[in-house]
Amino acid sequence: MTLHRFKKIALLSALGIAAISMNVQAAERIAFIPKLVGVGFFTSGGNGAQQAGKELGVDVTYDGPTEPSVSGQVQLINNFVNQGYNAIIVSAVSPDGLCPALKRAMQRGVRVLTWDSDTKPECRSYYINQGTPAQLGGMLVDMAARQVNKDKAKVAFFYSSPTVTDQNQWVKEAKAKIAKEHPGWEIVTTQFGYNDATKSLQTAEGILKAYSDLDAIIAPDANALPAAAQAAENLKNDKVAIVGFSTPNVMRPYVERGTVKEFGLWDVVQQGKISVYVADALLKKGSMKTGDKLDIQGVGQVEVSPNSVQGYDYEADGNGIVLLPERVIFNKENIGKYDF
């Protein structure tokens, strides 16, 4: 082999290796983080995110802490940033606790989005939102009103924690709607299960024992709602209306037995899918602005809205909210159509 030919082959080999290296580096990697693992709601969202990854040809990793904590989520965020992930999508356990880590991630060029539960808007680019507080808070009250159907009633609120962003926004709107439209309803207690199945069941049983004449439990949380239903069955209380948000697969037996007449949610699989599609669009296009639309396979079209739809004052370029197209009320007639 001549020296010239050897150099040519060596150069081509080096170029080939460089091209392969560039392709590896260019492959998108997206982290999808729940509040905690082991809960059906978050698993379903992760399934939707990973389905979107397959459709788009991007690598989506689903991982979260075993308990809902700021420190657990911060550790994961930092790990994903250090591993070179291009985008992070997180369901935040706190509106501000994750902000230092997320802002550092953005400074390093990582796209940061939220889903399910938001941070302060300045700590992310876009929030993939299941519904506005007014929509979801109103949904909770309307479901309860259809069953309580009386002017004077006693109502309890029961959900995950006093600090979680999304549920507290919904409950604030729900309580305002009760004050305006059902002034005879008395909110006798607001209690928390802290995303723990055992504690949630104990808390729900405690509510029912303490307020034997309770008319409704409003439980907008994937752990609290089934816990309230199970508590009612354990205590043989068939008079209290139990409404809230959880997944159809978890709530199916309670609906079939008549313990829960109706409950609500949104398609969390779609929410996970939309989140990854939006992150992918940002990585490819660089930015999106209010009014921009995005077509999502199997879902339809979504649009970027201003942060004001969530009641925020903060607005900035490359920052906004993407609302899910619809929310669902599940009952005995339609629950069989859903599997998540």
Swiss-Prot record:
Pfam family, one: Peripla_BP_4
Secretion signal, residue range per the UniProt entry: 1-26
InterPro entries: Bact_Solute-Bind_Prot2, LsrB, Peripla_BP_I, SBP_2_dom
Protein localization: Periplasm
Gene Ontology terms: cellular component: ATP-binding cassette (ABC) transporter complex; outer membrane-bounded periplasmic space
Entry keyword Signal: yes
GO molecular function: carbohydrate binding
Domain of life from the UniProt record: Bacteria
Listed GO biological process terms: transmembrane transport
Keywords from the UniProt entry: Periplasm, Signal
Stated family: Belongs to the bacterial solute-binding protein 2 family.
Function: Part of the ABC transporter complex LsrABCD involved in autoinducer 2 (AI-2) import. Binds AI-2 and delivers it to the LsrC and LsrD permeases.
Subunit structure, interactors included: The complex is composed of two ATP-binding proteins (LsrA), two transmembrane proteins (LsrC and LsrD) and a solute-binding protein (LsrB).
Protein name: Autoinducer 2-binding protein LsrB
